[in-house]
């Protein structure tokens, strides 16, 4: 705080990542820091106490992945951090948001500590036993909520990246992966594996981020990650490589369709329809830009695989400064559409 408190990008301060220990001591540290410099927003940490989240008196915002055992606020989880999220367990859809998890209409399932007051927690990539009290299933933070480390969708290695390591750091991990693939007789398929896994990862990131932008009571998100992380056993979780350069999976323009100051969204129940079913969609806009869009027009167009227009309507936007706008409901008769080919 004394060295970097004036830095223009220093606006939020977290005590650490996935901490355990004394809530009283953490709160005391926050109090001391806020008395020293109250210009920033402070929080006890990111995803502290994991299955047993709590809001401290001096928290200005809350960061976590769940609010109780089954009140999940991100799309996917590791097996050691179960239950898993909707992207892993539910049929593909664009209906999911986290508003009902943040403000539930029922008592959620609460994880329970064992008789000796301990619980198994995620610790790195393994498990660890710690002291814990029973989680509060009705926990609803009264401060803004930020969802923690969303994403983490991995791609297959791109072995062409090995050539980029021209300095003291070498891509030994990629070299090992390539050698193993060659030994298995699968090296000729490496590009197909990379491209296919990349398309799946991009689709998962799209749903992960759109679910966040559909959530009107969620204040923000921490993404893991924009770029690959080459340490700790390798995490190829970025749409960019470790050099912050595109992998060729998705363009910046395509990425901004679902992660930008303005994100246009369509809620519909599924991706596959029979010809006797109606296609229904609710069109909405998550908007965090400063420009006044009152009176602007939103045109909704549906095209087939040959780019022939099947549906097109324009809707006026009524805007008075809000971040979430409901624009229109559309209904489309699928019997009018020939079966489409998906490449």
Where are these regions (language model features)?
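Active-site neighborhood of glycoside hydrolase catalytic domains
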Residues: 1-56
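Short, basic, helix/turn surface patches
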Residues: 2-10, 68-77
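Secondary-structure transition/capping motifs at alpha-helix termini
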Residues: 3-7, 35-39, 215, 290-293, ...
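Short, hinge-like loop/turn segments at secondary-structure boundaries
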Residues: 31-32, 58-63, 164, 239-240
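Catalytic-site neighborhoods of secreted/periplasmic enzymes
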Residues: 44-69, 74
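Substrate-binding clefts and catalytic carboxylate motifs of secreted carbohydrate-active enzymes
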Residues: 75-312
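Buried hydrophobic-core signal for structured, non-transmembrane domains
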Residues: 279-285, 329-332, 343
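Intrinsically disordered, low-complexity Pro/Gly/Ser/Thr-rich segments with frequent PxxP/GP/PP motifs
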Residues: 296, 308-339
């Amino acid at each position: 705080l004394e060295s970097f408190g004036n830095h223009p990008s220093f606006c939020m301060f977290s005590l650490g990542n996935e901490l355990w220990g004394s809530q009283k001591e953490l709160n005391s540290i926050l109090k001391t820091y806020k008395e020293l410099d109250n210009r920033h927003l402070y929080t006890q940490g990111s995803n502290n106490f994991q299955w047993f989240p709590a809001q401290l008196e001096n928290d200005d915002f809350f960061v976590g992945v769940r609010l109780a055992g089954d009140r999940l606020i991100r799309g996917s989880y590791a097996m050691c951090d179960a239950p898993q999220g909707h992207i892993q367990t539910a049929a593909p859809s664009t209906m999911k948001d986290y508003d009902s998890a943040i403000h539930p209409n029922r008592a959620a399932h609460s994880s329970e500590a064992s008789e000796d007051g301990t619980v198994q927690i995620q610790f790195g990539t393994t498990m660890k036993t710690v002291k814990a009290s029973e989680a509060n299933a009705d926990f609803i933070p009264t401060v803004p909520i930020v969802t923690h480390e969303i994403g983490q969708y991995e791609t297959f290695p791109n072995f062409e990246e090995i050539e980029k390591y021209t300095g003291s750091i070498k891509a030994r991990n990629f070299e090992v992966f390539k050698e193993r693939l060659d030994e298995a007789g699968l090296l000729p398929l490496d590009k197909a594996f990379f491209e296919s896994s990349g398309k799946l990862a991009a689709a998962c990131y799209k749903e992960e981020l759109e679910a966040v932008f559909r959530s009107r009571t969620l204040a923000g998100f921490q993404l893991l990650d924009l770029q690959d992380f080459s340490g700790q056993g390798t995490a190829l979780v970025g749409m960019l490589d470790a050099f912050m350069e595109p992998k060729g999976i998705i363009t910046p323009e395509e990425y901004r369709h679902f992660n930008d100051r303005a994100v246009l969204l369509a809620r519909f129940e599924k991706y596959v329809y029979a010809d006797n079913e109606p296609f229904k969609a609710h069109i909405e806009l998550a908007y965090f830009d400063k420009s006044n869009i009152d009176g602007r027009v939103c045109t909704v167009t549906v095209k087939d695989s040959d780019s022939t227009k099947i549906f097109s309507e324009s809707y006026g936007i009524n805007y008075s400064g809000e971040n979430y706008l409901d624009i229109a409901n559309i209904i489309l008769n699928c019997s009018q559409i020939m079966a489409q080919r998906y490449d």
